[in-house]
Amino acid sequence: MAGHSKWANIKRQKAVVDAKKGKTFTQLSRAIIVAARSGVPDPALNFQLRTAIDKAKAASIPNDNIERAIAKGAGTFGGDNAIFEAIRYEGYGPGGVAILIEAFTDNRNRTAADLRVAFSKNGGNLGETGCVSWMFDQKGVCVVQGVIDEEQLLEASLEGGAESYEMTEDEMAEVFTDIGNLEALSQTLKNQGFKVTDAEFRWIPSNSVEVTDPDQARSLFKLIDTLEGLDDVQNVTANFDITEELMALSIS
């Protein structure tokens, strides 16, 4: 289970020194649009939409913007009604590191072209669908924060149908489950008094590539920064592991 948190830990540590924190308004709004389009445009009845709205509010996106995004997804907005779809792209970074990119786009050709340029300029290459996804498993993950009694967390996790959990920090834990059980697990944890700060689908690497070369590490983080900076990109996942010391040198 330790492998679950390697990429998640890298992302958390990287966020501390990143100039940009979290997602842009554009990326968060698109998540709402896609969620509203893929289900009913009512957050009370659409878990994906409810989660997207919670993330937008946490990023201080105004309610007017949130309502506009819901209307766009529902097709009831009077202005621009561009149709966004969720697409997964796959490729390799420097040293053969596997990279998955989840995107929300209204123009597949534009997104693919932007990604291809990002990869080629940073020592990687955009591959075909399926070239690296077999190295990952998709899971539902609930992030729990606050003072955590591990015994109580174990009991609540079992009750909620979790597969495993991991204490990641003094006051943070991640609980893993099948993607179809994420909403039920999140609700069970909340009912048991836990503060669930995020509930998301996450790609978990089945194995990790150890990165020890400083130049490779810098190239990897530059590539990931470039990919994450694209408006169409929602999330980037990679299957490498790195020491905290080398990571600090690579992203400073």
Curated annotation (Swiss-Prot):
Pfam families xref list: TACO1_YebC_N (PF20772), Transcrip_reg (PF01709)
Listed InterPro entries: Integrase-like_N, TACO1_YebC-like_2nd/3rd_dom, TACO1_YebC_N, Transcrip_reg_TACO1-like, Transcrip_reg_TACO1-like_dom3, YebC-like
Top-rank taxon: Bacteria
Main location: cytoplasm
Localization: Cytoplasm
Keywords recorded for this protein, A-Z: Cytoplasm, DNA-binding, Transcription, Transcription regulation
HAMAP family membership: Transcrip_reg_TACO1 (MF_00693)
Similarity section: Belongs to the TACO1 family.
Protein's name according to its UniProt entry: Probable transcriptional regulatory protein Npun_R5651
